[in-house]
Regions:
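A short SAM/SAH-binding and catalytic strip from SAM-dependent methyltransferases
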Residues: 112-125
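Conserved class I S-adenosyl-L-methionine
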Residues: 2-46, 60, 156-162
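A short glycine-rich, Lys/Arg-flanked "PGG" loop and its adjoining helix->strand segment in the class I
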Residues: 126-137
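Core SAM-dependent methyltransferase catalytic element
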Residues: 184-185, 189-211
Length: 211
């Protein structure tokens, strides 16, 4: 693990735990006010009615899914995030605390699993294996992995650094495809263009058992 990776791990640990109360403000700032819209953009990819969200954060997506009448449950490792989400959802919440590497639900329990802007746990083979286990045949694992805002400041920054969003996209797409394939998902990667930016969505489909 290099120095940058160590720094990011420490940063996210602080961000999701003692400083979880700053999540909405920070997310809105780095996305130029588009964070929630980006999160909601994953909804059209969801199939079925029994949904699991990995890493629910402060509960914005859960609120929408429950309001739409879906049987949605969610889990997050962070206790502070659970507190924020419970405040938002009230008595309607179906939240549990736990690790994505040890999903506490039965085999083939869900039609779709969603995760928006997850940290490195989503690349863990144990996470992907667990997701595969709890999905029904033809179920979907849908991950909103990254977003690139359409903002003049960022365009200038990419010119200065000599990098481009397309370089980052290809690197992330390659990494996710390899991870999903190892977990026996049929994988599709989409770049979703919205008014405020470009979103990278990875969809892993659990193919029907041949048995």
């Amino acid at each position: 693990m290099n120095l940058i990776q160590r720094f990011m791990r420490v940063f996210f640990n602080l961000f999701y735990h003692p400083f979880a109360f700053t999540y909405d403000l920070v997310a809105a700032t780095v996305s130029f006010g588009n964070w929630k819209d980006w999160v909601y953009s994953i909804i059209p990819f969801i199939e079925g009615t029994r949904i699991l969200e990995l890493g629910h954060g402060p509960g914005h997506l859960q609120r929408i899914l429950l309001d739409r009448g879906l049987d949605s449950v969610a889990m997050d490792e962070s206790a502070p995030m659970g507190t924020l989400a419970k405040r938002r959802l009230g008595s309607s919440h179906k939240l549990t605390r736990g690790l994505a590497q040890k999903i506490p639900f039965a085999d083939e329990a869900f039609d779709s699993i969603v995760s928006t802007f997850p940290t490195e746990y989503i690349f863990d083979m144990q996470t992907l294996s667990e997701a595969h286990r709890v999905l029904r045949n033809s179920g979907r694992l849908i991950v909103l992995l990254a977003a690139w805002p359409k903002n003049p400041l960022l365009g200038w920054l990419f010119k200065v650094t000599g990098e481009s969003p397309s370089d980052a996209r290809e690197l992330i797409k390659s990494k996710m495809k390899m991870a999903f394939a190892r977990a026996e998902f049929k994988t599709e990667v989409q770049i979703v263009e919205v008014k405020s930016g470009s979103l990278l969505v990875v969809i892993g489909k659990k193919e029907e058992s041949k048995c």
